């Protein structure tokens, strides 16, 4: 428990996987939290239910088409209803102590910047794309205003907790589950369907991030995120495949010792930590029983089968890293959407990203607004690349 009065909290992306974890924590601990705003993309029914359950001051749907439904569902309550970009930005301007940012994709970038400017004390960040595309521009804005970014990704939350004890590390290792195709051959992956890619063996995640895990683009983005969040040189970041997803990160120190953070693979645990930070949560999470696992497995990633993993390092080492990171993220978002819509094959995704990075990672990006503009350019060019590809026969 906080024992310091209730913390005012908003949740962006409250109807998604991480958002629902946050809502459950807020529901279970009403003495610790006051809910100011809940923001969802389009699920008006679940959002309205959450707003009533948590007595939220405000509920916003990003899709204008869902506004009337949300307004009708909350008629007779004291909940203020909003919609569209204006509604999301209004929610991000409200006076809160902490905000959970669980919106998917680069759509979170401008709300994160608005939160930073609004004077929020901490952001529980479950969106890596805003850091990938905002880079040091976003990190510096947070530092200048005294905003603490507490990552919710299990790997980065682990690094955050480890470095809080001793930040003088030599190397950091991020673990990767390997996704659903860890032991598939390239030939087998030629026939991957969206339903195959969405069937993650360990984590329950949204559609986009599930595909990212399957291609291992997710880990490429996490390498970039770790670089910016913790000021780590790309050469000091390693990735190790760990199918059990029990060890989330390892920090190696100059004296030859290493410290890891371990827990059961449950996103509620880092979400709980980020919501209560800087206090320690005393509510019980899932307990790790190592003996029940018998053994833990670690292996080197296979870049021949999962070339996308290397894209994060390539982007950071390029002559125009900001542009390269934006191109990587934009191309991936477009390609994943095309794959989920049965327009391209699974193995087309890394090829499309590589082509986009080769063609587009070549300009200066000097502001958040320029990052947004360049993202749109990259998306348009990536759609052109997608349009040149024929849909694989197995998808028809």
Curated annotation (Swiss-Prot):
Name of the protein this chain belongs to: 1-deoxy-D-xylulose 5-phosphate reductoisomerase
Alphabetical list of Gene3D superfamilies matching this protein: 1.10.1740.10, NAD(P)-binding Rossmann-like Domain
Required cofactor names: Mg(2+); Mn(2+)
GO BP: any one term: isopentenyl diphosphate biosynthetic process, methylerythritol 4-phosphate pathway involved in terpenoid biosynthetic process
Family: Belongs to the DXR family.
Amino acids binding 1-deoxy-D-xylulose 5-phosphate: 128, 154-155, 177, 200, 213, 218-219, 222
Pathway listed: Isoprenoid biosynthesis; isopentenyl diphosphate biosynthesis via DXP pathway; isopentenyl diphosphate from 1-deoxy-D-xylulose 5-phosphate: step 1/6
Organism: Anaplasma marginale (strain Florida)
The reaction(s) this protein catalyses: 2-C-methyl-D-erythritol 4-phosphate + NADP(+) = 1-deoxy-D-xylulose 5-phosphate + NADPH + H(+)
Keyword terms of this UniProt record: Isoprene biosynthesis, Manganese, Metal-binding, NADP, Oxidoreductase
Keyword RNA-binding part of the UniProt annotation: no
GO terms, molecular function: 1-deoxy-D-xylulose-5-phosphate reductoisomerase activity; manganese ion binding; NADPH binding
């Amino acid at each position: 428990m906080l024992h310091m009065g209730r913390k005012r909290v908003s949740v962006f992306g409250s109807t998604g996987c991480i958002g629902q974890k946050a809502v459950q924590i807020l529901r279970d601990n009403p003495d610790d939290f006051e809910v100011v705003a809940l923001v969802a993309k389009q699920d008006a029914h679940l959002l309205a239910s959450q707003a009533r359950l948590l007595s939220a001051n405000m509920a916003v749907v990003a899709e204008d088409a869902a506004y009337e439904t949300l307004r009708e569902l909350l008629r007779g309550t004291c909940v203020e209803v909003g919609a569209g970009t204006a509604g999301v930005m209004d929610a991000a301007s409200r006076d809160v102590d902490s905000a959970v940012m669980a919106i998917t994709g680069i759509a979170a970038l401008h709300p994160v910047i608005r939160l930073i400017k609004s004077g929020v004390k901490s952001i529980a960040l479950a969106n890596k794309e805003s850091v990938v595309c905002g880079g040091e521009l976003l990190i510096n804005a947070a530092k200048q205003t005294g905003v603490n970014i507490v990552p919710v990704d299990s790997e980065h939350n682990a690094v955050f907790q480890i470095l809080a004890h001793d930040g003088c590390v030599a190397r950091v290792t991020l673990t990767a589950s390997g996704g659903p195709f860890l032991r598939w051959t390239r030939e087998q992956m030629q026939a991957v369907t969206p339903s195959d890619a969405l069937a993650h063996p360990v984590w329950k995640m949204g559609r986009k991030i599930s595909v990212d895990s399957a291609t291992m683009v997710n880990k490429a983005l996490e390498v970039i995120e770790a670089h910016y969040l913790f000021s780590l040189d790309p050469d000091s970041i390693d990735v190790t495949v760990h199918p059990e997803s029990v060890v989330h990160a390892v920090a190696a120190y100059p004296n030859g010792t290493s410290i890891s953070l371990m827990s059961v693979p449950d996103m509620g645990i880092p979400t709980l930590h980020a919501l209560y930070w800087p206090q320690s949560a005393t509510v019980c999470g899932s307990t790790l029983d190592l003996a029940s696992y018998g053994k833990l497995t670690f292996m080197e990633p296979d870049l021949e089968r999962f070339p996308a993993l290397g894209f994060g390092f390539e982007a950071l080492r390029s002559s125009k890293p900001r542009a390269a990171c934006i191109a990587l993220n934009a191309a991936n978002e477009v390609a994943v959407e095309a794959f989920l819509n049965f327009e391209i094959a699974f193995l087309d995704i890394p090829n499309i990203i590589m082509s986009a990075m080769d063609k587009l990672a070549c300009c200066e990006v000097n502001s958040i607004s320029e990052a947004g503009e360049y993202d749109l350019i990259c998306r348009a060019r990536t759609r052109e690349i997608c349009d040149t590809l024929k849909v694989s026969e197995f998808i028809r």
